[in-house]
Amino acid sequence: MKNLKDKVVQGIRKGPEEPKAKSYRKSHVPFRLNFLFFIIFALFVSLIVQLGYLQIVNGDNIEQQLKASSVVEVKGSAPRGMIYDASGKALVENQANAAITFTRGNKMTAQDLLETAKKLSELIEMPVDKNLSDRDLKDFWLADEDNLEKATERLSDEERSLGTSEQYTATVEKVTEEEINFSDAELEAATIFKRMNSAQSLSTVFIKTSDVSDQELAVVAENMIDLPGISTGTDWTRKIVEGSSLASLIGTVTSEEQGIPEEVLDEFLEKGYARNDRVGRSYLEQQYEEVLQGTKSISEISLDNNNNIESQKETFAGAKGDNLVLTLDAEFQAKVDKILQDNFQKLIDSGAAEYSPGVYAVALNPKTGGVLSMSGYHHDTGSNEMQENAIGTFINSFVPGSVVKAGTLAAGWENGVLNGNEVLLDQPIRIGSDVKASIFNPTGANNRNLSAEQSLEVSSNSYMMQVALRLMGINYQSGISIPTVDRQGDVYEKLRSSFASFGMGTETGIDLPGEATGISTSIENMDPVSDGGKILDLAFGQFDTYTTLQLAQYAATVANGGKRLQPHIVDGIYDNDETGGLGSLIEDIEPTVLNEVGLSDAQMQIIQNGFYDAVHGTDAWATAKGLASAKMEVSAKTGTAETPIVDSNGNTISLVNLNIVAYGPSSDADIAIAIVMPQLKGDTDTHPNIQIAKEIMDAYYDLYMK
């Protein structure tokens, strides 16, 4: 009770509690919400600004990027430039052909190609590729997914573990001969498939380029929706228009299937070529590839979301390559061809050319180095026929004979062992038991004094050998001995250096690939003792070999007074007119002086006088009198080289190379020529080299100097 009473009293004393004032806490929710709204607003404004920037400022760029993701540019071929002769006649042109093409999509499978190839083969006449290999046929068979699965089941466990490429190779080996024994219709489809399969992703190849009919073009166009990647277009083929002898000089162009030759593939790829581009593979077409190559056409290919081709549109038709105008005239070239053919055929018919490998002639302009004609014919031993071989004028070399003797005189003058028009006694040169002599003085019964000029007129071997001996420090006396080969090196060098200054034994610089420089045997490859006399043979043209072009450059160098000009077959590079024909000049090929012969005017005059006297001199032994009746005044130097052979029975047959170099008119030459007729029977007395030279000079006169 007491406790209860105390609590009551205590409660009465405190009295009732007054109510406390109600306490309110400030809420943070509205602030956070407002801040969030502000951030959203700011982002929204930023988005609007960015969209505006993209749409207004950078809209074109964005549009291009979007387009680029769905549109791909593909390049196609363009016609090569044409080749014309000096008169403007087309020698090589492009023949346009309707074509059926294929552009490979990004995701096209072998099965896709197979289905398209089969459909297309039913719509067009497709010639079967004669070069279809077993591998091509097996690839065609395996393109069918069911066949691929069937062949894959034949793999061993070990073969299944191989990488993708190796496993496919193993699968190919499992295809049987019976499975690739196709019908003609299937072979047509296989041909189409092979060409389609050669295309890289988003590249275009030609399926059919010849004999495409209007009906085939129409039916392909009608069915394009069912032929993914197939289209129609235009292709070109290279056609030589005039002059069969120019075909080899012009060269060839690879096909699309051949593409870029392996040996120059990397070089061309770096220049932006594609692997299957058609390029020049020989001679003019190769030398002037970058000039003749056209600018490729450009097409836009639209892709759908699955990277399949939706459409294809040409945006740039391409541009034909630039054109070449040559220095030679097809009409003069044809005349030279006929002159060689007619004269050499007579030698074949008479048996004189039985062992001859052919006949070659080159004509140059000695004022510019321009090639006026290059003609050659190859002949097989015992044959009654000949084949065009103009390239033999600069890739085949022969022993020249006495035509080189101006080079020997030059070596004597340049090395201080010969004085001006010095007189030497023509006599047989006896080295030990060996005897070498001039044709007109084989035994010494016709010993006579000759000046340097006369030595050219009558073609003195003795004079030239004495110059060579002087280069060794020897004044000739009968029965002397000469140094062994290993001590003659500087003499070979001196003679060959002088020869090279005229163009013999060195590159002429012709604007054609594959030029030969002839054969110059080094002293390291000679017998020190038995070959000791070869240096004398070199002095009168019986040792080293030269091309017909080198001899023509030599003749031109004598004709113009000592300037060795670089020969060139291209006179200028031209663009195209509106019709694709010959346009205006882009680049003129100017004369290039490679070197000047190190002779004085007086020394060069002695050489020119000697060449003139060989034709017009009064000496009974003047070697080229047959040219005196030419329609223009001609200077010349003949050459006869002994080139015996041993036949299959072991018999030695005496043969000679009959050669000549000439130029005219003598006082101001417009043409310089070289003619080489190797390995004719030694009993040839008709001087066919002189006859051919006369006919060529007369043909030039009739065409350009009348």
Each model region followed by its residue ranges:
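A short acidic/glycine-rich loop-to-helix N-cap element
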Residues: 678-692
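Short, basic/aromatic recognition patches
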Residues: 63-76, 332-354
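Active-site His/Glu-centered metal-binding helix of metallohydrolases
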Residues: 52, 403, 407
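Membrane-proximal periplasmic segments of bacterial cell-envelope enzymes
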Residues: 1-290, 296-310, 316, 468-472, ...
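Solvent-exposed, polar/charged alpha-helical surfaces in well-ordered, non-transmembrane soluble domains
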Residues: 111-122, 218, 222, 247, ...
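Short N-terminal helix-loop-first-beta-strand/juxtamembrane motif that initiates sensory/input modules
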Residues: 80-83, 227-231, 349-364
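Gly/Ser-rich catalytic serine loop of serine hydrolases
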Residues: 80, 394-404, 543
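Beta-lactam-recognizing serine transpeptidase/beta-lactamase-like catalytic domain environment
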Residues: 90-93, 98, 302-317, 328, ...
